[in-house]
Amino acid sequence: MKAQFSQGTLKRLSMMRESEGSQSRSKRPFIVLGTLVGIFFASTAVLAVILGLKSKAAQKNVDNELCVTPYCVKAANYLIESLDETVEPCEDFYHFVCGAWIKNSRIPDDADSINTFSTLRTQLDYNVVDILTQPPSNDTAEPTALDNARILYNSCVNEQNIEDEGTDTILSIVNNELGGWPILEGSSWDNSTFNLFDLLLKLRKYNNDIIFGIGTSVDEKNSQQYDLVIGQSDIGLGQRQYYSNESKITVAYREFIRDLAKELSDNTSMVDTDVNDIFAFEKEIAKHYWTTEERRGRPNATIRTTVGSLTDLLKTSFDFSTYLRSAYAWSGVTLDDSDVVTVHELEYLNNVSSIIDQTSARLLQNYIVWRFMMHRVDNMPKRFRSIKENFQHIFRGTTSDVSRKIICGNFVNGNMGFAVSALYIKKYFDDNARIQSSEMIGNIRKSFSDMIEKSSWMDEASRKKAIEKAEAIDEKIGYPDYLAGDNMTQLETQYADYKFTSSYINNVLKLIQIKAKEEFQILRKTVDRKAWGFTAPTVVNAFYAPSKNQISIFWFSYLSSSIFLFIAFPAGILQMPFFDRDAPKYLNYGGIGVVVGHEITHGFDNSGRQFDKDGNRIPWWTKETVQEFNERKTCIVDQYSNFTVPNINMKANGNQTQGEDIADNGGLRESFFAYQKWAQANPNADKKLPGLSKYTPEQMFFINYAHTWCSKMTDSYAMNRVLSDVHSLGQFRVIGPTSNFVEFDRVFKCQPGQGNSRVKKCIVW
């Protein structure tokens, strides 16, 4: 563009030219020089004006391209503070996005980790406490269920009353109902009245599954009804691997038992011997305990039988058939011989039954009552809780205790979540989130169907059924509708028995018996495929359940369920950095969008693929398609099994995490393609974030995705995650999917073979 001079400048130049003739010849060189200098400075000044105008115009254009809403400013801030731009994104995208966040974040003393989810959960925790501590509203009538939730909370935080009540109630149950705890009585304990069957039955009424687990679940072969389930229960340290070698954790576990026994009794004559025997017995049981990997890796190892045929199947001295009948009869449910029973971990049941047959009455009584007391310590005075907290510090790697009000808020929310949610959604939830989330789910579902349509490894019949299943997925967003209305009849009915007093220990004992009865009584109910389910909106997670083919988005949650075929997104997850109604869509699709895709993909992972669109576990893929799927799945398993966990030098377990890894990879691809389509239909609608304008919208999609997985954890917690969690660590949830995605390579101009770009991409969906 040519320089444009003002009229004043042009006039001055003309006057200089007219005066040249009247000057003497001797002064002409100086005049010419002066004129040239003047022209130079004038031109420079004009050029400065021009450049200034251009700069202002350019700045105005930049400003028009920026999103400067409060949310965008906040989002820009958290992302800028997270990025480490000294790291090459094509070499290590996780540390490129999370490097500064990791450096500057500090794990709270009372926590074993910090990440995006824990930050949201912390906010939820305080919101719940606020709801439970605020006085009832004078303007509107609040449900009685919420009043009872507040009573339960107040009994939990009333430390003085807990101290005054002491341990009399718990010890009365132990001594008068359960037959005593031998470790407290030394050699005076009388074993003549010991009855394993009666002991386990009494504890099951307190919602304790010890050694053997029983309960109710959706029938995998007929998703319209419930059936009975039998299998292994849990073990004290959670996973078999902890018992393999002596460690600071096994030492701390024995100290937990020993210190509790000594605090409860002055008779310490046999404490050390009993503690060692209890641990040795549990260690023996643990040898037969199925790990998370083994349970997920043997989906067809379950056996379907009936109550009448159960004894013939198990052939153990422990009468499981009578045990089931007695437990359900306590809740008012009479079992028939024809009632279906799904048996899990059959080898465990047989092997542990044989161990029990060779174990003394004293040891069985000691172990079983210990497992009851292990949980009831939480409801006892502070000096007893401190014993468990000392163990937790070693097991989790923490250095201080969670505040009492947060513990109590979580306890009430975990047991009366829908009552808490009734007020939570009115106070904290934006209904626009439901509308926008529903639209995104539709777009991402369509994206997944398109991916199925283009999959070359599926035969036509399997592909058609897969698309039908994807289109049939039911979705739950935010909260059930009845919580938002004025009619609280359904809520009041749900919590009709939840009436409490000022006695915390008695409230807890009543509550766990209610929960036990509810699980048994649901057996005779019909499965409501459209119902919200059992998870309240006040959680931070999302869910997919195969036997309902349903997805749910709540305000606070991100899990997966193998019971119902639906996906759930509770209210708690629909906020920054996952979602905001004012956010550019590349942030929402990179956040909650990937979560949506993740949950949809669960319907087609190694477990979900075995359920049809109606939620029944039946073969609906051809053998050829199953073989093709397994080859692609193996690629994912091998890839993730080669990841090494920093600091603890452990390999990730790709077999254990395969379902979640498949969902992570598919979810990222689905959401990205859905965002691409949205962006094509809405050109230039997404503005850039201040301070991050050098990144394209597609790059920002991946950056926000990775940011949701920034995490930091103690070594103890990292080991626990590797041993037991079906989810990969955050670092691998970023590196794995992005390194398999050619669109990531294109967006960041990566070359296959670089650190964050695999040459051989592992692609299932």
Residue map of PLM features:
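Helix-loop boundary elements of multi-pass alpha-helical membrane proteins
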Residues: 3-42, 252
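Asp/Glu-centered strand-loop micro-motifs enriched in Gly/Pro and often flanked by an aromatic residue
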Residues: 20-24, 77-84, 106-108, 188
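Alpha-helical transmembrane segments in eukaryotic/viral proteins
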Residues: 28-65
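Intrinsically disordered, low-complexity linker/terminal regions across diverse proteins
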Residues: 51-53, 121, 278, 284, ...
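Short, Gly/Pro- and small/polar-rich lid/capping loops
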Residues: 55, 59-81
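Active-site-surrounding "flap" and adjacent substrate/cofactor-binding loops of secreted or lumenal enzymes
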Residues: 67, 71-72, 88-91, 96-168
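Hydrophobic/aromatic-rich, well-ordered segments within soluble, folded domains that form packed cores
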Residues: 82-104, 242-262, 457-460, 658, ...
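Noncatalytic, helix-rich "gating/capping" subdomain that lines the substrate-entry/channel surface
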Residues: 127-443, 480-483, 492-519
